């Protein structure tokens, strides 16, 4: 009889694995098929965003935020613009606020659609992503009509948004909403109620609410464990106070609850979008989309060609940029992945002294070992999918 002790063996999951959600490398220590330890290796997409921002003006820094969570770009721009506006002490006009909320909810649907359908693909269902991508395509066309770009929109500006949306675009977004709710019902029937999907996700990746707070979780992760915590309700920003929507909350804190919550959040986002479309179409929703302060927001092209002062403002704004009063501020928004925060320190110049980005996915990924321990190897990709991680924001 062989007396050699049985030892654990280590395998690499990624960094080019199709279920790794980007450039993630996990070193898994296995005892047979049971996971004993998970060691996430990050940094393969590190671009030094926070340091690069210190050498550029505030306006030049906005596009960097599109490249963090590149699945829902405008939500990140929102946090950065809110932080700058807080330091400058300026208020965004009502129409600008409504447009921001509208595009942030479109970003939420873009993110959740990708996540829930690819989660189904990770556990073996190949049809949902095809249905989901069809709807995402329509939303990306809206992005393109508003900003000229399908993904890296660069649409939000300190003080408002870059340009107004034509009424036809607002109407088309409104017309998209109701048919999409039918697609949500179809997706629900297709895989949320599917018994194989349930077997692969129910009671997998369970985490208690207490542990959620300890690990610094936010967003869907804490709502899946039973906390009705949503920054849009808890600390309302822009015009979210006017919006009527519910916060879906789970009970068990497992993969399945998190996916059901994302499905319901898409319905709630559609509800908010319909309210925004209605308000934007009313007389009270008309008006400027950015603050009239030309030290921060450029004058219109027509004005610039007639007025010398407007030309000077434009020239100064795009050569030197605007100066932000010295101080420090933290602004968090309810991004699709969780609380996306920007801690901005200004030294009174035209460039940020320091900009610390709080990426929600970073805290979620750090708990991979805690969530996967004693799970089966096949459950690792299901747990990873339920965390909804994008490496643009984790590695920055």
Curated annotation (Swiss-Prot):
Predominant place of localization: membrane
Keyword Transport part of the UniProt annotation: yes
Family of this protein: Belongs to the complex I 49 kDa subunit family.
Locations listed in the record: Cell inner membrane
Principal EC category: translocase
Gene Ontology molecular functions: NAD binding; NADH:ubiquinone reductase (non-electrogenic) activity; quinone binding
Highest taxon above the source species: Bacteria
The keyword Membrane is annotated on this UniProt entry: yes
Quaternary context: NDH-1 is composed of 14 different subunits. Subunits NuoB, C, D, E, F, and G constitute the peripheral sector of the complex.
E.C. designation(s): 7.1.1.-
Name assigned to this protein: NADH-quinone oxidoreductase subunit D 1
Catalytic activity as recorded in UniProt: a quinone + NADH + 5 H(+)(in) = a quinol + NAD(+) + 4 H(+)(out)
GO cellular component, one term: plasma membrane
Keyword annotations: Cell inner membrane, Cell membrane, Membrane, NAD, Quinone, Translocase, Transport, Ubiquinone
Function statement: NDH-1 shuttles electrons from NADH, via FMN and iron-sulfur (Fe-S) centers, to quinones in the respiratory chain. The immediate electron acceptor for the enzyme in this species is believed to be ubiquinone. Couples the redox reaction to proton translocation (for every two electrons transferred, four hydrogen ions are translocated across the cytoplasmic membrane), and thus conserves the redox energy in a proton gradient.
Organism annotation: Beijerinckia indica subsp. indica (strain ATCC 9039 / DSM 1715 / NCIMB 8712)
Its membrane topology: Peripheral membrane protein
Gene name of this polypeptide: nuoD1
